[in-house]
């Protein structure tokens, strides 16, 4: 009996891990927004670690957003003087 229970448990874990890798765990919120601790909608996507809601997007797009936000912050500091 214990062996069957262990087998069922292992099978359940394998199925859950497989579905997570395939991107079946949905994003939270709408329009691709996701929590930084959630899997993205697509297995090729990542969650950008930026101010505000984490956005599910491609890794390259995260880098572009970081550069744009960095420039915006520089302009704000310059014009505040």
Curated annotation (Swiss-Prot):
Locations listed in the record? Secreted
Disulfide pairs here are: 27-41, 34-48, 40-56, 47-62
Tissue occurrence:
Expressed by the venom duct.
Tell me the keywords, alphabetical order: Amidation, Cleavage on pair of basic residues, Disulfide bond, Secreted, Signal, Toxin
What Gene Ontology terms describe where this protein resides (cellular component)?
A: extracellular region
Task: Give me the residues of the propeptide, which is removed upon maturation.
Answer: 73-81
The protein's GO terms of the molecular function aspect are:
toxin activity
The signal sequence is 1-23
Q: Where are residues bearing Leucine amide located in the sequence?
A: 69
Q: What is known of its domains?
A: The cysteine framework is XI (C-C-CC-CC-C-C).
Which family does the similarity line name? Belongs to the conotoxin I2 superfamily.
Q: What is this protein called?
A: Conotoxin Eb11.3
Species per Swiss-Prot/TrEMBL record: Conus eburneus (Ivory cone)
């Amino acid at each position: 009996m214990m062996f069957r229970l262990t087998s069922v448990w292992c099978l359940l874990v394998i199925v859950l891990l497989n579905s997570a890798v395939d991107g079946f765990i949905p994003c939270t919120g709408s329009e691709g927004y996701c929590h930084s601790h959630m899997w993205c909608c697509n297995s090729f996507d990542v969650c950008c670690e930026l101010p505000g809601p984490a956005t599910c997007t491609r890794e390259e797009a995260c880098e572009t957003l970081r550069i744009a936000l960095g420039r915006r912050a520089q302009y704000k500091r310059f014009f505040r003087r």
